[in-house]
Amino acid sequence: MLFISFAFTDSSKIILDRKQSKNAFRQDSSLDMSITRNESELIEFIEATMTTHLIPGLSVSVVKEDNIVWQKHFGYANIEQNISVNENTLFILSSISKTVTGTALMQLFEQNLFELDDDINQYLPFNVSHPDYPLIPITFKMLLSHTSGINDNWSVMPYYDGDSAVELNSYLSDYLEPDGELYNANTNFTSYMPGANFNYSNIGAALVGLLVEEISELPFNVYCNENIFEPLQMNNSFWFLSEIENLDSVALPYQLN
């Protein structure tokens, strides 16, 4: 199996990752794949794509089985300071982190700690219900499939300001409970009945993270470190900037004006 991984600077912070430890993948010194024969074309394509889409920095790895067969770094991690992307650059992965969030929850499912059709209110410290359909329970399956009816209200979803000083529990209760400071029945929920329609929801994914905390009785980042990152030797993957020793290694996110 051939796996091609792209990491590039993004505008939102959720999880960071970089090239894994040397024990995780073996570098294939022979590089006897067709990609090496077409390397110049691949580089030309990547650079043209970066120009077209105004991508400041980019890393590419091609993995075959457990071997890194090709990797290269392009552009800048920090344009203002003229810092180039290198093998130690940490990238903000944005919604790719939902694969980790989902994995964390499903690990707990495999331990028979809940059922996918369970009402999430059985496990939360506060109640969540759709204002138009209060008698229809929101289930784990709905959260994982983005059919919960919970909507993203971007006016109260800060994601540019680094690590939040607000606990996940507090933020979500303010967003989802009727007496919460961030609650708005019209904008925080869709018009659809829970389970009826797909609506991509970052708040729903955050709620999955809170459920991991409540069921595992561990902070979400601690659970992921102990049960996902450490076992997989993802030694440079983090949920918080405060966990990173050298912040200069983080590719600065940019946004088009």
In which residue ranges do the predicted regions lie?
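Bacterial Sec-dependent signal peptides at the C-terminal "C-region" and cleavage site
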Residues: 4-14
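Acidic/histidine-rich, surface-exposed loop or edge segments in extracytoplasmic proteins
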Residues: 20-31
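Short, conserved catalytic-motif segment at the N-terminal edge
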Residues: 31-91, 115, 181-189
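Extracytoplasmic/periplasmic, Sec-exported soluble proteins
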Residues: 34-41, 54, 85-88, 92-100, ...
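Active-site SXXK
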Residues: 40-46, 60, 66, 90-120, ...
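Short, surface-exposed loop or secondary-structure junction motifs
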Residues: 78, 132-257
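Short, glycine/proline-biased beta-turn/loop segments that scaffold the active-site neighborhood
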Residues: 116-131, 231-232
